[in-house]
Amino acid sequence: MTFNEQPTGTTGALSPLIYQAYDANYTQAGFYYQFEIYVWSGTTTLPITPIVTIDRKPDQFGGGRGWIDAHKIAAQYITTDFLVNGTYKPNIGDGAYYVAVKVQGIYDSGSTAQITSNTQLVTGGWNYTIDGLNADYSAKYVYTDKPAVYITANTTEYYLWYDATQITTIGIAAYTTTPNAVSTSDTKIQGIDVMQLITAAGTSGEDYPIVFSYSGGSVSIPIQYQCQNKYGEVDIHFLNKYGVYDSFVFNALSRKTINITREQYNQPIYKQADLNTAWSYGVQITTPYHTNGIEQIVVNTDYLPQAYNEVMKQLQFSQNILMVEGSDVYSVRITDTAYTEKTIVNDKLIQYTFTLEYNQPVINKIVR
């Protein structure tokens, strides 16, 4: 049997996870391909029982091949609440799971040998169509596409994530720290709070790069302190294409609005004790109900280099955004439906504006 499978690296479960099988016995009576899909956390050892078994008849228009796409099954297990704000060195936890597939051909008079695929780690990330089929993140050591980290003296937290099976130390200036111990799927990808690392290194206010070292090389990302604007900054963490919470500081004008919704009911005026009371100006004849509001905030970036366009595009596609307000963290989403990529040639100075909408109403009516 020929089995086209996923590579062994890490990839996103929001894009197709295609597995394709072909066996010359597909012309046998009653032939079908049986795919067993495994999604689990822990060590790389496959569980005894698959999550689901899918039988596929050979595709007569595809030369007798059979295929499945496992991404929707895997995505059901991946969570987006793995980041506990304030953690110095967080693990990805349930934000990543292992996926593997077994396949064999079964027909009336027999069956083929069962083949087991590679084991792949999947996150809540995605791949662009132009990346090709079954793309993965094997070439990435640090899971961000930002060319630099921009912060202010008032930034409280800022996360970068990396492949903890490859990175050996993370450092600023002469100070270094090491990843948490890696043993299972929930620790293979880890993060670092840049602000706490800066404090530990004693380099607050200084533009030292953060360096992620691995065997045979390193990844260096510049850190630049910017003057905070008079409006106050808006800090967010957003799920990027790699399925981890990338951070960004909106260090320009921001403005909040609340869109209020309500219904109303006109009561009969004769419900009062007497007509004089009924005709009083203080009587609430028109009564509002189901009153609530959705809060939005319009945020603006500071001037950015053109190399930041990919980060802004990933923010637009993000499946979840966390906005930090003091000690509170709110889930928000972008309501803009169009993204215009800006360039130095066309726009000279590059700034972006986004409208963020809170994912919970102003008045607590979440429990139905």
Residues covered by each model-derived region:
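Extracellular/virion structural assembly segments
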Residues: 2-4, 8-13, 24, 159, ...
